[in-house]
């Protein structure tokens, strides 16, 4: 199973995170399938590759709680629901 989760980058006391699609069994810093975004909590900056995220969500990827909150704030799930209604 694939999850959308945060991968820690940056230096000490100055963490930034990449949002990655990664296999559930691999560790946090393990090899990811694809980088789909970036999150800087200090500057409150977020970059999301929305088409890639929607593609992984349609294939059944599960976001972690923190990634879910980031995606919800960016209103990605509205687009996801619109895509779901078009196909059904």
From Swiss-Prot:
Superkingdom, taxonomy of origin: Eukaryota
Coiled-coil intervals, chain numbering: none
GO function term, MF aspect, one: structural constituent of ribosome
Cysteine disulfide links: none
A cellular-component GO term for this protein: chloroplast
Major localisation: plastid
Pfam families in alphabetical order: Ribosomal_S16 (PF00886)
GO BP terms: mitochondrial translation
Keywords of the record: Chloroplast, Plastid, Ribonucleoprotein, Ribosomal protein
InterPro entries associated with the record: Ribosomal_bS16 (IPR000307), Ribosomal_bS16_CS (IPR020592), Ribosomal_bS16_dom_sf (IPR023803)
PROSITE patterns in the record: RIBOSOMAL_S16
Cellular location(s): Plastid, Chloroplast
UniProt subunit comment: Component of the chloroplast small ribosomal subunit (SSU). Mature 70S chloroplast ribosomes of higher plants consist of a small (30S) and a large (50S) subunit. The 30S small subunit contains 1 molecule of ribosomal RNA (16S rRNA) and 24 different proteins. The 50S large subunit contains 3 rRNA molecules (23S, 5S and 4.5S rRNA) and 33 different proteins.
HAMAP family given in the database record: Ribosomal_bS16
Function per UniProt: Component of the chloroplast ribosome (chloro-ribosome), a dedicated translation machinery responsible for the synthesis of chloroplast genome-encoded proteins, including proteins of the transcription and translation machinery and components of the photosynthetic apparatus.
Similarity comment text for this entry: Belongs to the bacterial ribosomal protein bS16 family.
Name of the protein: Small ribosomal subunit protein bS16c
Taxonomic placement: Eukaryota, Viridiplantae, Streptophyta, Embryophyta, Tracheophyta
């Amino acid at each position: 199973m694939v999850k959308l989760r945060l991968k820690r980058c940056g230096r000490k006391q100055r963490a930034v995170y990449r949002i990655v699609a990664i296999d559930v069994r691999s560790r946090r810093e393990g090899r990811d399938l694809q980088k789909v975004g970036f999150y800087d909590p200090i500057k409150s900056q977020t970059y999301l590759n929305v088409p890639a995220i929607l593609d992984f969500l349609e294939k059944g990827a599960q976001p972690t709680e923190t990634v879910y909150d980031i995606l919800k704030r960016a209103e990605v799930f509205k687009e996801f629901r619109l895509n779901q209604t078009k196909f059904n």
